[in-house]
Every structure is written in C-alpha cells, then in structure tokens.
C-alpha cells in the first residue's frame, strides 16, 4: 500500500506511460519530488489506482506533455484533485482523463489550456460526485470528439459551456447524458454543422425545464436516438428549425 520513490531521479525521463497503472492497492503516493520537465507522455499514468485517496501534483512540470489520455482513469477513491498549475498548452489528448473518478468532489481544471486538444471523449464521464466544474475557459476550437464528455455527472447543478467552440466536433453522443441535476444548460451557441451523432445527447437530464436547440444545424446528423429521452421536466423545447 506504500511505495517509496524518494530516491528517484526523473530529470531525464521523457515518458511515464502506464507508470502506476493497476497499482490498485496503493492508498498514498508521494511524487512531489518528481522532475517531469522532460516528460512528453503521461498516458494512463495513474490508471486504475483504485484506492489512491489523494495525490499532490502541484510541482509537476507538464509543459512538454502532449498526451494525458486516461491519466486518472478509474481512480475511484480520489476526492480532490488540484491541477490548477498544470501547463497543458501542448496536450492534444485528454480523452477518459477523469473517467470513473466517482469520488471526486473537487476538481480544478479552470486554468487548462485546451487549444490543441482534438479529443475530449469521456473526459469527465462518471464523475458523479462533482457538484461544480469550471470549464468556462476551455478552448475547444480543435476538438472533434465530445462523446460522453459529461456523461453521468449526475450531481452537477451548473455547467457553463456557452463559450464552447464546437465547429469541428463530429460526435456529441451522450455528451450530457445522465446530468440529472442540471436545471439549465445553454447550448444555444453550439455550432453543430459537422456533427453526425447526437444520440443520447441530453438523455436523462431530468431537471432541465427548457432547452434552446433552435440554432442546431443537423444537416449532417445521422443518429438522434434517445436524444431527449427521459427529459421529464422539459416544458419548452424549440426544434422548429
């Protein structure tokens, strides 16, 4: 349950892929002395560390990292994660990054530079203890996949995606599926001109009373099954265009 890495010199390490993958009995992990200034890949670094309750990454230098896919996937016991100091300017992949982190009550990604990201698939999928999540400054101008991005975030009471640039997004399948505590959601500015899949996009959004999708361009959409399924409180829905 304990791993002593205090003597590790990581100054020349360029990849930390799968470094702690499957260490599912670790409860604590001290990587505060890690020098990550040369690391370019953190794919699945902490994946399936199911009992890890906290981790201090405040000293991580991520300025050269391009891949954070699956980084904290299935870290079921993490309750808080402060990544406000992460430099993500070169990262292109963040899919599944926090997928299955169902004990997280605090997650700070507000300073993420997402300008080079192409995939946000399943990024926050199953983060069902989060009551708030600030993604208002996310630059999504290069993202093509938002499938299940917020799926199962059933404790979120607010979510500001009004500034999302979705002009390149092709997949929105299940994007907000199961966000049952959201009482409002502004997607009125979404550019959906490239989207082909909207299946289950708002399925199970029980608390939404109004939803403006009147500006949605659905000319390329081939899948819409269950898009508003079980949106039981919707009293206003404009799909006239």
Q: What are the language-model segments listed below?
A:
Residues 1-241:
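Negatively charged
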């Amino acid at each position: 349950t304990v791993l002593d890495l205090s003597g590790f010199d990581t100054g020349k390490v360029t990849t930390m892929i799968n470094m702690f993958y499957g260490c599912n009995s670790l409860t604590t992990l001290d990587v505060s002395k890690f020098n990550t200034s040369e690391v370019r890949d953190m794919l699945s670094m902490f994946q399936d560390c199911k009992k890890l309750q906290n981790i201090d990454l405040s000293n991580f230098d991520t300025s050269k990292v391009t891949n954070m896919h699956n980084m904290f996937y299935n870290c079921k016991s993490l309750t808080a994660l402060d990544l406000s100091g992460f430099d993500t300017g070169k990262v292109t992949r963040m899919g599944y990054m926090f997928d299955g982190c169902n004990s997280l009550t605090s997650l700070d990604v507000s300073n993420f530079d997402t300008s080079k990201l192409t995939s946000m698939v399943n990024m926050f999928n199953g983060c069902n203890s989060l009551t708030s999540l600030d993604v208002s400054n996310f630059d999504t101008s290069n993202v093509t996949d938002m499938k299940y991005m917020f799926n199962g975030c059933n404790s979120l009471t607010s979510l500001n995606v009004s500034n999302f640039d979705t002009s390149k997004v092709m997949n929105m399948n299940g994007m907000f599926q199961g966000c049952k505590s959201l009482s409002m959601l502004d997607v009125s500015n979404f550019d959906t001109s490239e989207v082909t899949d909207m299946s289950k996009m708002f399925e199970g959004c029980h608390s939404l009373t109004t939803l403006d999708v009147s500006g949605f361009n659905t000319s390329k959409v081939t899948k819409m099954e269950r898009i508003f399924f079980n949106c039981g409180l919707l009293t206003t829905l404009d799909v006239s265009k």
